[in-house]
């Protein structure tokens, strides 16, 4: 789960991580009032959406007086911001962060992520702050420094100091930088984050180490023990189809292709997408109906897939272990009738009650193409979609 920058900074502040003072605003008048309350000579007006690249898209403005705060708030609020992370459709700006300006001396990058290769949290840092870390990794990987953290003991002070020296934090500010990184790590672990990214981390003219931006992502599977974080969820920032899928315990991720996929099991779902790509097709989604899908869940899964106007055909690929193939077959038929499906539909069933499932499909009288294997199914749906 993602949260907004201002929310992330509030979480970090509670762990002793230094962030600029700021207030959220939902209207132009609230933005002006927030700037008045901050009482600083310079304010930064920042669009709040769940995407990076806001500055380049015109969503971050420096205001030197209240009139400029009003002007920028009017120009940003209610507009659709298109960045490299939003896709061409962009995201509507419904709230702003009004933040005190600061005298930036140098920008850095600091982030914590899970390294799946080592099964450890890794602290990454670079003195190339303010730019996309992926770009730094591609062009100048030698400028990224890493510390792998033993989960038994956590981030150690010497590791944070080594990072601070490697990215050339001024010696007199190393102590602050270490405290910053230790607080960031505590927030990451205690709040079950999957990403904690500060870009940029800055040193200021008055000798402070501060997070100028904050991106926190949380493990959705751990939200049951973080009610305070769950309350920060902004449904307006999420894909409507993903929200609908979550109501039925369906795992759905939209993609850019035109072949809808309905599969049980994440591994099989990824293999299905791979084989569709192998035969020169493009999957429109990842959709895992799970191991205990009912006919109702299958019907809802169809509706979600078909709500994507780019979908030109559907491939259902089910291995019946916990889930029985006859239940899936009944769900497919019910869904096809309910939604009035006119698109090509290829179904591959294997496992528990597979013969009964195939019999139900064959006797349905519907235009359903049966596949004998995953390869056969992928080839057929790619051919039908054209």
Curated annotation (Swiss-Prot):
CC cofactor note: Binds 1 Mg(2+) ion per subunit.
Protein residues bound to Mg(2+): 199, 213
Identification of the protein by name: Succinate--CoA ligase [ADP-forming] subunit beta
Gene Ontology biological-process annotations: succinyl-CoA metabolic process; tricarboxylic acid cycle
Role noted for this protein: Succinyl-CoA synthetase functions in the citric acid cycle (TCA), coupling the hydrolysis of succinyl-CoA to the synthesis of either ATP or GTP and thus represents the only step of substrate-level phosphorylation in the TCA. The beta subunit provides nucleotide specificity of the enzyme and binds the substrate succinate, while the binding sites for coenzyme A and phosphate are found in the alpha subunit.
GO molecular function: ATP binding; magnesium ion binding; succinate-CoA ligase (ADP-forming) activity; succinate-CoA ligase (GDP-forming) activity
Domain ATP-grasp: 9-244
Binding site for substrate: 264, 321-323
Transmembrane stretches, start-end: none
Catalytic activity: succinate + ATP + CoA = succinyl-CoA + ADP + phosphate; GTP + succinate + CoA = succinyl-CoA + GDP + phosphate
Xref: InterPro entries: ATP-grasp, ATP-grasp_succ-CoA_synth-type, ATP_grasp_subdomain_1, SUCC_ACL_C, Succ_CoA_ligase-like_bsu, Succinyl-CoA_synth-like
This protein's record includes keyword Cell division: no
Keywords: ATP-binding, Ligase, Magnesium, Metal-binding, Nucleotide-binding, Tricarboxylic acid cycle
EC number in record: 6.2.1.5
Required co-factors: Mg(2+)
Positions with a binding annotation for ATP: 46, 53-55, 99, 102, 107
A GO term from the CC aspect: succinate-CoA ligase complex
Family according to the record: Belongs to the succinate/malate CoA ligase beta subunit family.
Pathway: Carbohydrate metabolism; tricarboxylic acid cycle; succinate from succinyl-CoA (ligase route): step 1/1
Database matches in Pfam families: ATP-grasp_2, Ligase_CoA
Summary of subunit composition and partner proteins: Heterotetramer of two alpha and two beta subunits.
């Amino acid at each position: 789960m993602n949260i907004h920058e201002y929310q992330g900074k509030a979480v970090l502040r509670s762990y002793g991580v230094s962030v600029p003072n700021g207030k959220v605003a939902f209207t132009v008048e609230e933005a002006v009032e927030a700037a008045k309350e901050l009482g600083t000579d310079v304010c930064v007006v920042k669009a709040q959406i769940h995407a990076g690249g806001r500055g380049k898209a015109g969503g971050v403005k420096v205001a030197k007086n209240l009139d400029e705060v009003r002007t920028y708030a009017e120009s940003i609020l209610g507009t659709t911001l298109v960045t490299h992370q939003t896709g061409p459709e962009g995201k509507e700006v419904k709230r702003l962060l009004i933040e005190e300006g600061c005298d930036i001396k140098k920008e850095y990058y600091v982030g914590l992520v899970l390294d799946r290769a080592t099964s450890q949290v890794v602290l990454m840092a670079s003195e190339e702050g303010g730019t996309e870390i992926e770009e730094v990794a591609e062009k100048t990987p030698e400028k990224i420094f890493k510390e792998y953290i033993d989960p038994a003991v956590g981030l150690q002070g010497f590791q944070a100091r080594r990072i601070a020296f490697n990215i050339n934090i001024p010696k007199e500010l190393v102590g602050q930088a270490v405290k910053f990184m230790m607080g960031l790590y505590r927030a990451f672990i205690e709040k079950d984050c999957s990403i904690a990214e500060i870009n940029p981390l800055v040193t200021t003219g008055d000798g402070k180490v501060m997070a100028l931006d904050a991106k926190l992502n949380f493990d959705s599977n751990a939200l049951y023990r973080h009610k305070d974080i769950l309350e920060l969820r902004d449904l307006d920032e999420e894909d409507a189809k993903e929200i609908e899928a979550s109501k039925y315990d369906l795992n759905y991720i939209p993609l850019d292709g035109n072949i809808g996929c309905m599969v049980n099991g994440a591994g099989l779902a990824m293999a299905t997408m791979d084989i569709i790509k192998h035969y020169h097709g493009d999957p429109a989604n990842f959709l895992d109906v799970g191991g205990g899908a009912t006919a109702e869940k299958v019907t809802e899964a169809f509706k979600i897939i078909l709500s994507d106007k780019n979908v030109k055909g559907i491939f259902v690929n089910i291995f019946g272990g916990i889930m029985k193939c006859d239940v899936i077959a009944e769900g497919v038929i019910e869904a096809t009738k309910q939604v009035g499906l006119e698109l090509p539909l290829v179904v591959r069933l294997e496992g528990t009650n597979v013969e009964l499932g195939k019999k139900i499909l064959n006797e349905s009288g519907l235009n359903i193409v049966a596949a004998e294997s995953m390869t056969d199914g992928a080839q057929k749906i790619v051919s039908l979609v054209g």
